[in-house]
Swiss-Prot record:
It is found in: Plastid, Chloroplast. InterPro entries: Ribosomal_uL16, Ribosomal_uL16_bact-type, Ribosomal_uL16_CS, Ribosomal_uL16_dom, Ribosomal_uL16_sf. The keyword Ribosomal protein applies. PROSITE patterns: RIBOSOMAL_L16_1, RIBOSOMAL_L16_2. Part of the 50S ribosomal subunit. GO terms for biological process: mitochondrial translation. It comes from Liriodendron tulipifera (Tuliptree). GO terms for cellular component: chloroplast; mitochondrial large ribosomal subunit. Pfam families: Ribosomal_L16 (PF00252). Belongs to the universal ribosomal protein uL16 family. GO terms for molecular function: rRNA binding; structural constituent of ribosome. This is Large ribosomal subunit protein uL16c. Keywords: Chloroplast, Plastid, Ribonucleoprotein, Ribosomal protein.
Length: 133
C-alpha cells in the first residue's frame, strides 16, 4: 500500500483493453505475464513473492513489477443501504492482460520455471511464463 495518497477512497473503474505499459521484461530474464484482467490484492502479491523466494532460496533475484495502489472499500456486514461509502479495507493492483507481474534473474530456466509456476498458482488469473530475448 502507498505511504500516503491524495484521497482515501477511489471509484472502482473498469479494466478495458490490454496493458500498454509494464508489458516487457526490463530487469530479469524470466517473467510471469497476466493473460486476464483482474484486481490482485497486496496479500496475493506478497504470497507469490514469498513462494518464489522460498523456492529459489539464495540464488537469483526477484522483481515485483506491480504495486497495490488502489484502495477497496467494504461496508460493515448487515448495514442498510445509504449513509455513505464504506471504509478502505484492503489494497489492490489493477492488472490488465499482458502485464508483467514478476521477473526473475540469476537462476537456471528450470528453477525459474518451477518458482514462477508456484507463484502463478497464488494468482487469481491465468498467466504465462515468458523468457526475454
Amino acid at each position: 500500500m502507498p505511504k500516503r495518497t491524495r484521497f482515501r477512497k477511489q471509484h472502482r473503474g473498469r479494466m478495458k483493453g490490454i496493458s500498454y505499459r509494464g508489458n516487457h521484461i526490463c530487469f530479469g530474464r524470466y517473467a510471469l505475464q497476466a493473460l486476464e484482467p483482474a484486481w490482485i490484492t497486496s496479500r496475493q502479491i506478497e504470497a507469490g513473492r514469498r513462494a518464489m523466494t522460498r523456492y529459489a532460496r539464495r540464488g537469483g533475484k526477484i522483481w515485483v513489477r506491480i504495486f497495490p495502489d488502489k484502495p477497496v472499500t467494504v461496508r460493515p456486514t448487515e448495514t442498510r443501504m445509504g449513509s455513505g461509502k464504506g471504509s478502505p479495507e484492503y489494497w489492490v493492483s489493477v492488472v490488465k492482460p499482458g502485464r508483467i507481474l514478476y521477473e526473475m534473474g540469476g537462476v537456471s530456466e528450470t528453477v525459474a520455471r518451477a518458482a514462477i509456476k508456484i507463484a502463478a498458482c497464488k494468482m487469481p488469473i491465468r498467466t504465462q511464463f515468458i523468457i526475454s530475448g
